[in-house]
Each structure stands twice: as C-alpha cells, then as structure tokens.
A protein has these predicted regions:
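Extreme N-terminal, non-catalytic leader segments
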Residues: 1-8
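NTP-dependent small-molecule kinase module
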Residues: 2, 15, 120-207
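A structural/positional concept
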Residues: 8-14
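Hydrophobic/aromatic beta-strand patches that form the interior of the parallel beta-sheet core
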Residues: 9, 32, 112-117, 146-150
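Conserved substrate/cofactor phosphate-moiety recognition/catalytic segment
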Residues: 14-61
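A short acidic (Asp/Glu
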Residues: 19-22, 74-78, 160-161
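ATP-dependent NMP and nucleoside kinases share a basic, alpha-helical "lid"
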Residues: 52-56, 62-138
Length: 207
C-alpha cells in the first residue's frame, strides 16, 4: 500500500481522447500516460507499471492513469464468458499468471481506485461489451475502490470523471492480487445483476 499524498486512479478501458484532454487540463489532476503506447507491441504490463510508478510520485491531488497492468486479465476474463465465441479459461489463466508474476516481483501494485466509464447507472447494464471484469469480480473484491461514471458523450464523461474523483469513498485496501484472481475464477456474470454496491456517478442534472 502506497503512502503518499496523491490519489492514484486507473481509468479502465478505452477513454476518448477528448475526455483525457479535458481531464488533463484540471489543476487538480495529473494525467499520466505510458511512455510506450500500450498497443505498440511492447510489454503492456511493464508500460502500465511504469505509468503507475510515475503516478505515485505525482504532486497533484489526483493522478489519472489510462492504462492498467490488469488490462489483459480483464480482456481474457470477458472473452471467457463470450457466449458467441467461447474460449475457455486457458487465456485467462495465462494472463493471470503473467500479472501475478509481475505483481509478486514488485513491478506494480494496484492503484488506489479504478474508474470505469459505462453507459448506464444500472450495474447489470453498465458494461459496453458484456460481462466486465472491473464491474464484476474486481468490484466485488472491494466495492469502495471501483467507481463508475455513467455517461456516453465525451463532454459528460469528462465532467463525470472529475466529479467522481472528488467523491471517492474511503475503505479497506485491496486484498492480495491472488485473492482478486481467485474471485474472478469463481465469479459468474449473472451475479452482476445482484450487486449494487458500486459508486455510480452520472453527469450533473441540467438546470
């Protein structure tokens, strides 16, 4: 667990460039991009880990990181539950093993919070691509540490991200990554509809 004044938040999934640009203009937020693009063919875990390390040294109140060392784990978990093209657990286990090895070696630790852009305030319908690792097993591990911004337009998403950063809830730190992975192994997507513990933040109401 880090002990510094900056709150490190991973923005999970793909965020529009307009959202990142708008959030990056905030005086309270440092936008920490990876030094090497995640899709450049390099080590995605290493790129995300480096960004998280730099975020941990930021002096602003919040550091927003648009890459995640668990991104491949999240993608393979979602693919495992794709009823149209079922792939089984092999890829998930492979990516989980890579992430666990990097975590155990001290290459990264989980951020203070995860922030997820979603289309709905309904937890069962928040993911855009079916079962979602962040809204499912990760959130069930520590509900206070996964926040959701429910908006579809980039301008609303940017406002929602800034609003969410200012209303993050305190709570217990993450369990060991081994426990998170084990939760993912036994988590069934149908239980998404049964959980409403996430912090859901939508755009402000029009006046």
């Amino acid at each position: 667990m880090r002990r510094n004044s900056c709150t490190v938040v991973v923005l999970a999934g793909s965020a529009p460039g307009e959202v990142l640009a708008a959030v990056g203009r905030s005086m309270n937020v440092a936008l920490i991009r990876p030094e090497e693009p995640a899709d450049s063919g390099g080590d995605s875990i290493e790129a995300a880990a480096g960004a998280l390390q730099r975020a941990g040294r930021a002096t602003s109140p919040y550091a927003l990181v648009p890459v995640d060392p668990l991104a491949a784990v999240a993608a393979s978990w979602r693919a495992m539950w794709d009823v149209a093209q079922p792939q089984g657990p092999a890829e998930f286990e492979q990516e989980a093993a890579k992430a666990l090895a990097a975590w155990r070696a001290g290459r990264f630790e989980l951020p203070d919070y995860y922030l997820v852009l979603a289309r709905s305030t309904d937890a069962a319908d928040a993911g855009d691509h079916g079962p979602d690792f962040y809204l499912g097993p990760l959130r069930s591990s520590r509900p206070h540490r996964v926040a959701v911004v429910a908006a579809t337009e980039p301008a609303e998403q940017a406002v929602g991200v800034l609003q969410a950063l200012g209303s993050l809830r305190h709570g217990p730190w993450w369990p060991a990554l081994d426990e998170v992975i084990e939760t993912a192994r036994s988590f069934y997507p149908d239980s998404l509809a049964e959980s409403s513990a996430a912090r859901v933040v939508g755009p402000p109401a029009s006046s």
